[in-house]
Amino acid sequence: MEAYIRQKRATPGMVQASDLQLVRPMSAVNRNGREVHAYDGPMQFMMSPSNPDQIISSSGSPTTVTATGTGTTTTTGSVTTTPTSPYSDATLEKLTPSSQDSEDEESTPVDILPSSNSFDRHSDGHLTHSAPISPALNNNVSRDSQQDSGSSGNLKSMEHSSPQASGHNDAEGDVAGPIEQWVTQPAAQGVLYKCRITRDRKGMDRGLFPIYYLHLERDYGKRLFCLAGRKRKKSKTSNYIISCDPTDLSRQADGFVGKLRSNVFGTTFFVYDNGKKDDPVSPRLDLAVVIYDTNILGFKGPRNMTVLLPGMTEDDQRVKINSSDSHGQGLLDSWKSKHMDNVVELHNKTPIWNDETQSYVLNFHGRVTQASVKNFQLVHDSDPDYIVMQFGRTSDDIFTMDFRYPLCAFQAFAIALSSFDGKLACE
């Protein structure tokens, strides 16, 4: 019996919550009005209710324990190793905690928002504008479900394994060759480029027209300048000039790489290279289109965005698409007409609503530290775990921007600039 008790005490148990009032066995505590027979602890589960000097055996016949001068003698019956409790089955059933108790509210998993074309039905009455997206506090955020939109862009190497989604297995990239050429070349496969965007709002007119600087992060806190961008002052729509020369942000500068231009409502942005629109020798090429869902009625929730990119060839070269060519279609026209053979369609990853923090959260793996409506991650429907690009705030004027294949630094920077621009129909 002692060995059995020691084994029970050594076995780790699980404490379960229950509202039942447990009927505790007799003990030295709260024993007023009871007849105490000097047996306490596990021994009382084995004794007969009528005679405390009798032990109930498995056969039901009592075994009397008599103390003598030389030891203990037993009469009638035998003692077995498994004692039988004098309590009835109904009492034992009452003592047993229910295994059908519902989960605690704290352990209930957070529901994942389904992927859709708009977050309108997930609006929160306390939010007045687009809800900011917060970085997840842990790395075990549930992965959101992504719906297949049917895009058939020839992005052949996006179907990577999920361990590469967070970039832990990817090598950190560096500039290869002249900076003017590197910023427009597609990223190497299996390489993650970690960048930082700094917004400079100091000066006479930089409150309305700040300058954005893109730096590639290196070891030991070092950074390498890559690109700079600024909105043109005299333009009917938002028009950003992007250059490798931070001192000369004009289309005539030698470092001019391309531009970002929006429509009147600020819902669609077009990214072009430094080619000329009507030049047959060096025509202007479409590098990206960023589409934000309109939100005219003031619905709340994160901004939903679609990014269109030129497809990739077998030798990892970008397909040339010229929207100014009368004989061809641009990225936006191809997407509208469902001609997706040479178009790659990306979407922002669906955030998860967290009731505890009252915000939408995404797992940025430590690269984003502040909540912002500008925070986003771009994925392809064929592999939602492969994060093509992520962008988010770390301080008031500092943002991180990480990208990988098939994007180039110029495309990623232009997509990030579109997030900075004001959108009348999206707020």
UniProtKB/Swiss-Prot annotation:
- Pfam families reported for this sequence: Tub
Primary residence: cytoplasm
* Top-rank lineage group of the source organism: Eukaryota
Q: Where is this region: Disordered?
A: 48-174
**InterPro entries from the UniProt entry:** Tubby-like_C (IPR025659), Tubby_C (IPR000007), Tubby_C_CS (IPR018066)
Keywords (alphabetical) are: Cytoplasm, Nucleus
Compartment list: Cytoplasm; Nucleus
* Record's keyword annotation contains Nuclease: no
GO cellular component, as recorded: cilium; cytoplasm; nucleus
Biological process (GO) annotations held by this record are: protein localization to cilium
Cite the PROSITE patterns for this sequence: TUB_1 (PS01200), TUB_2 (PS01201)
Renumbered to this chain, the Low complexity biased-composition regions fall at 57-86
Q: Which family does it belong to?
A: Belongs to the TUB family.
| Protein name stated in the entry | Protein king tubby 1
Q: What is the lineage of its organism?
A: Eukaryota, Metazoa, Ecdysozoa, Arthropoda, Hexapoda
